[in-house]
Amino acid sequence: AFGHVIFKEETLMVKAIVGANWGDEGKGKITDMFASEADIVVRFQGGANAGHTIINEHGRFALHLMPSGICYDNVTCVIGNGVALDINKFCSELEDVKKAGVNPKLLVSDRAQILMPYHILLDTYEEERLGKNAFGSTKSGIAPFFSDKYAKIGIQCNELFDDEMLKAKLHNIVTLKNLILEHVYHKPLLDEDELYNTCMEYKKKIAPYICDTHAFI
């Protein structure tokens, strides 16, 4: 389940839509309904394993990262720092809505952490290792992502703009992950330079949307 927060300026009103039934409660539909009268809609947590469908005059949109409210000209949509940001999926969804004639106002928190390719690999390998006891993961990398977030080894969007910090962090990450890949899963190891180049690609894609969303709100 994931949630949204909606802000309406003239009344200083905040509405929070939060799931309480393990997903599929219709949060996206309700958020989209409220968003028509909102100024800001915030997707504050969750990842691309969740989803919501919006149907309007622009078409049918199956969204996984974009906040509900993207189809309204009056709304600024914010992806908050609690979101597991899969940048490739973010860009793919953005391209799809733009093709339908929608140009959303989007901001991404500079403190949002990035779901990396190795998160998806580790998610997949763990399901393989568990065999018949597998959790039934969507293999979107969500569990490894949040493990890294709480272990304080995740990569924040703002760190893409600090080469020295990014390279030091990647060195630490690769050292830790390669131990797991080699000794637990017996899989190919990660390459620091390859991951750095991936991060530079992410930087180009996401840079226009990054800001201090806390200050904005």
Pin down the residues of each PLM region.
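Non-transmembrane, aqueous-exposed alpha-helical and coiled segments at domain scale
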Residues: 12-217
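Short, Lys/Arg-enriched N-terminal segments with co-localized hydrophobic residues
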Residues: 1-12
